[in-house]
Amino acid sequence: MIEENKHFEKKMQEYDASQIQVLEGLEAVRMRPGMYIGSTAKEGLHHLVWEIVDNSIDEALAGFASHIKVFIEADNSITVVDDGRGIPVDIQVKTGRPAVETVFTVLHAGGKFGGGSYKVSGGLHGVGSSVVNALSTQLDVRVYKNGQIHYQEFKRGAVVADLEVIGTTDVTGTTVHFTPDPEIFTETTQFDYSVLAKRIQELAFLNRGLKISITDKRSGMEQEEHFHYEGGIGSYVEFLNDKKDVIFETPIYTDGELEGIAVEVAMQYTTSYQETVMSFANNIHTHEGGTHEQGFRAALTRVINDYAKKNKILKENEDNLTGEDVREGLTAVISVKHPNPQFEGQTKTKLGNSEVVKITNRLFSEAFQRFLLENPQVARKIVEKGILASKARIAAKRAREVTRKKSGLEISNLPGKLADCSSNDANQNELFIVEGDSAGGSAKSGRNREFQAILPIRGKILNVEKATMDKILANEEIRSLFTAMGTGFGADFDVSKARYQKLVIMTDADVDGAHIRTLLLTLIYRFMRPVLEAGYVYIAQPPIYGVKVGSEIKEYIQPGIDQEDQLKTALEKYSIGRSKPTVQRYKGLGEMDDHQLWETTMDPENRLMARVTVDDAAEADKVFDMLMGDRVEPRRDFIEENAVYSTLDI
């Protein structure tokens, strides 16, 4: 024991100043890039573009830039061009170096902290440019200012040569060109055009009148898009509702400024039952909402109730409409510009400034009250839609109680047809939603009972895109799923109570199976989205073919764009001598016995599963509404445009 203590003391004494590492300049960024850009995977790679684009957007917000161009160059590098004032090139007093060099080599340097350069800013703590420089093999900047073109180049964050004048110009602006470092971005350095284009379009919506374009110069991938919306977020709402039936044609739009905080709101009601509210602060999408959404929601509910009571659409003795009632079918975009935004969490997903609640509430209330008074016919339609939603909510109340559970892992109230697992470890547990009783039987027999649960469903579940809340909660299959998951429903939904952290959709490999899968994904997207966002949702990939020699299946072929090539290769492989392989086609899960289903589709060691994610909520919302909503024309157009990719089940 004494020897052990001596050894411990020796170890403690060895921890001294010589073991403290000091990272200078941008070394810290290269050492821990995830701290600055979130990850070094695809998301972090694209974050580099946003850091540079955000600087140009800041110039636009300040009123000095009107046109931004983004290029994916032929070598997969990025160029961002703006027509702003140009980054300062004079000497920065503290560093003794040109300001533009300081911006790209010193963390936390930028025009965003003093309060004079930019009234509002979307940049992350002002570190963006230097972080991009640190994580690029090469970066160069051209500044068009004071009649001269100034140029400087960097490699992995280090200065290659001093700032120099390389020509004359009669324009102003900044051009930044960079190449991501493959030593940092080991997963991929290939930019996704669609990811960049969607965000650039969003920025054009959020900055009314701004012209912003994206051009892809890569061989075989050449394309470009130009975005410019004089209607701003009003145009954004029209875009979101493009495939929906609207209650009134022109979105309600209001903007105002109070105490230095600018607020814009655009909204429009549709005939759907779903709510789509998107909020932004300084152009940053606040996925988790925040105080601007709180102010908007409170004002919307209060103003509609006041109008309904004053105009006798709601009687004095009738209950007020709830927020849930008045938001049914609503599409809204809220955008605030704040000189000192406070975001909760490192990823800026929730606005935390408490003063924004009352400012948003007041500005929107005044404008919305005016609109209702000036448009009585539209006002009545809005109130009547809320009243219908209220009646459906009351009818659904009893059904909702069925989905509530005392505890996430309590099994006393689980649906009778659920074959549950024995483990209480949600992190390990898997719930398979299986199409049909016969396949459900095979899955129950073939599963690992310790951590795999089976919930069979009969036929096609309800299309929630077209259904009222009372019908949704009256549906037995839907109730069974919510009860089995243990997450609750609606306002009671809590993803942390999920009894399984893998929710696997397992349907037949035919058109009916694809339809059931789509119905389930629609349900999950609309009413269990946190489960989707947590990465819990998967689609099983059962084999589509089995290659048999005699009575033995030698190889299974998984579905995919190369499935026919796989099949051809397998047939050639087993066509040896006199043996003639045959092909077994699996159209239904029930065509496999329990052992085959386990081996091919459920065994974690062998199976192939596709994880379902949502990269773009606005686009996903539009697609679900188009495919599953009431309007036939957009769906028919989509089918005609994509018919070449369709699967015929004949």
From Swiss-Prot:
It comes from Streptococcus pyogenes serotype M3 (strain ATCC BAA-595 / MGAS315). Binds two Mg(2+) per subunit. The magnesium ions form salt bridges with both the protein and the DNA. Can also accept other divalent metal cations, such as Mn(2+) or Ca(2+). Mg(2+) 1 binds at E435, D508. Its main location: cytoplasm. CDD domains: HATPase_GyrB-like, TopoII_Trans_DNA_gyrase, TOPRIM_TopoIIA_GyrB. The keyword DNA-binding applies. Heterotetramer, composed of two GyrA and two GyrB chains. In the heterotetramer, GyrA contains the active site tyrosine that forms a transient covalent intermediate with DNA, while GyrB binds cofactors and catalyzes ATP hydrolysis. The record marks K460, N463 as: Interaction with DNA. This is DNA gyrase subunit B. Residues 429-543 form the Toprim domain.
